[in-house]
């Protein structure tokens, strides 16, 4: 952590005292730079190329040292386009890794990989910056207690609970509600935990990044009138950027999240969309640096790169970083090295189902496919564990009976199976709930449901106490008391 000078004057004068090198070779986004003997920059140091191109346009390219080649040469990867650079141009060694702004001033703003704001709202009002490269917390600093991270979303808390300081994989195609689920989690952590969120858009579509920003402004997650009251900082490295930027933008987002955890001692939610693009960018850089490819053409350092990012995402005694990572599975092949390496780090998986979204059940989280290492009686307690297992058994039996129902109809089922189907349909509907961030679209107020309330509600459905209530009473409500009240209203309307 360091504090920058408030004016640009002293910062510029210190650059004059830095090592100066010259570009010797340019291959796409990779530069070879020659430095004077004995003045070689360190690995990961940031280099800056400033000057003008052939038509007089200003050039300002930041690179990161990746290899020391010998003969006073270093090889660096550019964080922006290298158009207009020529051999012989002057290169300044900043003497330190890339540093980005951190702290409360980053909330409500959009940054690129270098920590520069790209939302046209002026400079960031902070003097504190932090280098993007650092080691994970020391073993003694880690918080080893297993604790549940309550999200207020029934289906998640009951069937695939998140671990405080854990890592969650979010699997889902286009249009099943990933963005809405992400925004609801950002909103809920701010309300229930007093925490903040950092969103890292790694190699995503520019349009999606823009849509997310606009939706966050609409739903109040980003407060336009008072930026300081926003609950999220956004860091984007889009698909059109060089591989260096896409490879490092995850670390930029993580560095901002670490400050909230270590200095502000807050619970932080870190979103990475998409973790596969981080691996993909690393693969491109690896090839450009001339490394021998490994399995399926991936970089030989795949596990190391993934580990260096993931091991920094953890709980310490000060606070926690809970990470939710969207995972793209190439060609639906779960044995591909990229998703396979990611799975090794995940504590829970939340799978979104197109079938549930088509039924209008939101959040469209698949209760049978989603998993969590936290769903153990020793961690969540016997009562929660038993309830979750019974819910899954009921839904699984309903799934098995669906073919019979489709062919023969409900009447051909045994009394016991008909009861199971009726309860399963109530459970399926009760797993839906209205979201705060969707209020502007649905008109129904959002609901945050505590874990104890969630468990109590499903116990009542499973016990048979609510068998007489119509299933539509359980659709898009918060806790079980709202469902019974809704059932009474429906009865009243019929009369």
From Swiss-Prot:
The cross-references to InterPro entries, in alphabetical order and at most eight, read: AAA+_ATPase, ATP-synt_VA_C, ATP_synth_F1_bsu, ATPase_a/bsu_AS, ATPase_alpha/beta_chains, ATPase_F1/V1/A1_a/bsu_N, ATPase_F1/V1/A1_a/bsu_N_sf, ATPase_F1/V1/A1_a/bsu_nucl-bd
Q: What's its catalytic activity? A: ATP + H2O + 4 H(+)(in) = ADP + phosphate + 5 H(+)(out)
Q: Which SUPFAM superfamilies match?
A: C-terminal domain of alpha and beta subunits of F1 ATP synthase, N-terminal domain of alpha and beta subunits of F1 ATP synthase, P-loop containing nucleoside triphosphate hydrolases
HAMAP family documented for this protein: ATP_synth_beta_bact
Bilayer topology reads:
Peripheral membrane protein
Give the EC class as a word. Answer: translocase
What does the similarity note say?
Belongs to the ATPase alpha/beta chains family.
Q: Describe the protein's quaternary organization and the partners it interacts with.
A: F-type ATPases have 2 components, CF(1) - the catalytic core - and CF(0) - the membrane proton channel. CF(1) has five subunits: alpha(3), beta(3), gamma(1), delta(1), epsilon(1). CF(0) has four main subunits: a(1), b(1), b'(1) and c(9-12).
GO cellular component, alphabetical, reads: chloroplast thylakoid membrane; mitochondrion; proton-transporting ATP synthase complex
Q: Where located?
A: Plastid, Chloroplast thylakoid membrane
Q: Which UniProt keywords apply?
A: ATP synthesis, ATP-binding, CF(1), Chloroplast, Hydrogen ion transport, Ion transport, Membrane, Nucleotide-binding, Plastid, Thylakoid, Translocase, Transport
Q: What is its EC number?
A: 7.1.2.2
User: Which SMART domains would you find in this protein's record?
Assistant: AAA
Q: Per UniProt, where does ATP bind?
A: 172-179
Q: Give yes or no: UniProt keyword Translocase.
A: yes
| Keyword ATP-binding assigned | yes
Instruction: Please identify the protein, giving its name as recorded.
Output: ATP synthase subunit beta, chloroplastic
Q: What role does it play?
A: Produces ATP from ADP in the presence of a proton gradient across the membrane. The catalytic sites are hosted primarily by the beta subunits.
Q: Give the main location.
A: plastid
Among the record's GO biological process terms, what is one? proton motive force-driven mitochondrial ATP synthesis
The UniProt GO MF terms for this protein read: ATP binding; ATP hydrolysis activity; proton-transporting ATP synthase activity, rotational mechanism
């Amino acid at each position: 952590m360091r504090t920058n000078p408030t004016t640009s004057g002293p910062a510029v004068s210190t650059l004059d005292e830095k090592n100066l090198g010259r570009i010797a070779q340019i291959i796409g986004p990779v530069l070879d730079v020659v430095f004077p003997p004995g003045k070689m920059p360190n690995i990961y140091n940031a280099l800056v190329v400033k000057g003008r191109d052939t038509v007089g346009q200003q050039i300002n390219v930041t690179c990161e040292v990746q290899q020391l080649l010998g003969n006073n040469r270093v090889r660096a990867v550019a964080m922006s386009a290298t158009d207009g650079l020529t051999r012989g141009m002057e290169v300044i060694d900043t003497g330190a890794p890339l540093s980005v702004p951190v702290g409360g001033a980053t909330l409500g703003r959009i940054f690129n990989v270098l920590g520069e704001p790209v939302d046209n709202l002026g400079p960031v009002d902070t003097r504190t910056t932090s280098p993007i490269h650092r080691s994970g917390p020391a073993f003694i600093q880690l918080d080893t207690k297993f604790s549940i991270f309550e999200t207020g979303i029934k289906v998640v808390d009951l069937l695939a609970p998140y671990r405080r300081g854990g890592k969650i994989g979010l699997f889902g195609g286009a249009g099943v509600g990933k963005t809405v689920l992400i925004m609801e989690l950002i909103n809920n952590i701010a309300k229930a935990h007093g925490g903040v969120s950092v969103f890292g858009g790694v190699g995503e579509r520019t349009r999606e990044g823009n849509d997310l920003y606009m939706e966050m402004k609409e739903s109040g997650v980003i407060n336009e009138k008072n930026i300081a009251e926003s609950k999220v900082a956004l860091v984007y490295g889009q698909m059109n950027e060089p591989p260096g930027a896409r490879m490092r933008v995850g670390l930029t987002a993580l560095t901002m999240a670490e400050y909230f955890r270590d200095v502000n001692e807050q619970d932080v939610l870190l979103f990475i969309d998409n973790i596969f693009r981080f691996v993909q960018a690393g693969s491109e850089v690896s090839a450009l640096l001339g490394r021998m490819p490994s399995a399926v053409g991936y970089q030989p350092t795949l596990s190391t790169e993934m580990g260096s990012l993931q091991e920094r995402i953890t709980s310490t005694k000060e606070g926690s970083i809970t990470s939710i990572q969207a995972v793209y599975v190439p060609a639906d092949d779960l044995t591909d090295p990229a998703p396979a390496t990611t799975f090794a780090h995940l504590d829970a998986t939340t799978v979104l189902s197109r079938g549930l979204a088509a039924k209008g059940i939101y959040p469209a989280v698949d209760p049978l496919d989603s998993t969590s290492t936290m769903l153990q009686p020793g961690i969540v307690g016997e009562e929660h564990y038993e309830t979750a297992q019974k819910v899954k058994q009921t839904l699984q039996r309903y799934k098995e009976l669906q073919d019979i129902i489709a062919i023969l109809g409900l009447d051909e089922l045994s009394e016991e199976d008909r009861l199971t189907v009726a309860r399963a349909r109530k459970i399926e509907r009760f797993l839906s709930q209205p979201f705060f961030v969707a209020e502007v679209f649905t008109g129904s107020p959002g609901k945050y449901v505590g874990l104890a309330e969630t468990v109590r509600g499903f116990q009542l459905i499973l016990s048979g106490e609510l068998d007489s209530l119509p299933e539509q009473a359980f659709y898009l409500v918060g806790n079980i008391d709202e469902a019974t009240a809704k059932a009474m209203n429906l009865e009243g309307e019929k009369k």
